Regions:
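Short glycine/serine/threonine/alanine-rich loop segments
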Residues: 44, 73, 105, 160, ...
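N-terminal helical cap/lid subdomain that shapes the substrate entry/recognition surface
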Residues: 3-13, 18-97, 116
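Hydrophobic residues in well-ordered beta-strands that form the structural core
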Residues: 21, 109-111, 187
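Residue-level marker of regulatory loop/turn positions in helix-turn-helix DNA-binding domains and
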Residues: 92, 110, 143
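A generic structural signal for short
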Residues: 23, 52-53, 88, 106-107, ...
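Non-catalytic interaction surface on structured domains
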Residues: 94, 102-107
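Asp-based, Mg2+/Mn2+-dependent phosphohydrolase catalytic module
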Residues: 1-9, 101, 114-115, 119-223
């Protein structure tokens, strides 16, 4: 194990576009369904719905949080609808499965989606038995990443010491609250989110492009 990470006992992973590649286009399908949901709910055309969708995402953390705050949307109905996508696009990444099995300590998924959807994704990826728990949007009381309370709630729920924890995400903005409470942070730079060149990157400890390869590299590094 890389000595710089030898203190890590809790390995926390985002789900979408983190445990599977952006190229699978699974989240792109979900994003499209979210747009359609907003269209139907608010009786808007596609362009107007897209503006509402992205506006809520940036202001509230997720489109769902915005719809709940502004329109009283039922989260269970929303999540069942937008997660009704074809998961045959997902493939098992043997290198990632092996690396996760070798990681010492606890492994958890921290997602703004819900546990039923996350479980289906993990099963398709061959990762159904790789994680101790899934901390989902229901568990955050619908205060999703990057709300700082979501991170503290995760630590409280599982008795995690943030200073002995590492968090992996493809959305850089979701790493800042993790860093603020003492976690090591890993940003997967896979094109799902672009961080401006002049942005403050002090909350990102590691920038990677391939999660499986990076995990193998830290496991095999001794100095």
């Amino acid at each position: 194990m890389n000595p710089a990470l030898s203190h890590v006992r809790n390995w926390i992973f985002d789900l979408d576009n983190t445990l599977y590649p952006v190229s699978a286009n699974l989240f792109a399908m979900i994003d499209a369904r979210i747009g359609q949901y907003v269209q139907k709910l608010l009786n808007l055309d596609a362009e107007a719905a897209h503006k509402v969708q992205k506006g809520y995402f940036h202001a509230h953390g997720t489109t769902l949080a915005g719809l709940m705050a502004e329109h009283g949307t039922d989260p269970h109905h929303y999540l069942a609808d937008v997660h009704d996508v074809d998961m045959s696009v997902l493939e098992v990444n043997e290198a990632l499965v092996e690396a996760l099995a070798r990681l010492p300590g606890r492994k958890l998924v921290f997602t703004n989606g819900d546990a039923p959807y996350a479980s289906k994704v993990l099963d398709k990826l061959g990762l159904g038995a790789s994680f101790e728990a899934i901390h989902d949007v229901h568990a955050t009381q619908y205060r999703p990443k990057p709300d700082p309370q979501a991170y503290q709630g995760l630590c409280d729920a599982y008795g995690l010491d943030p200073h002995a924890s590492l968090f992996v995400e493809d959305m850089a903005r979701n790493l800042a609250p993790a860093k603020a409470i003492g976690m090591k942070t890993v940003w997967i730079d896979n094109g799902s989110e672009q961080v401006p060149g002049d942005a403050d990157r002090s909350y990102i400890d590691y920038t990677i492009t391939d999660l499986g390869a990076w995990l193998h590299s830290i496991l095999e590094t001794s100095e």
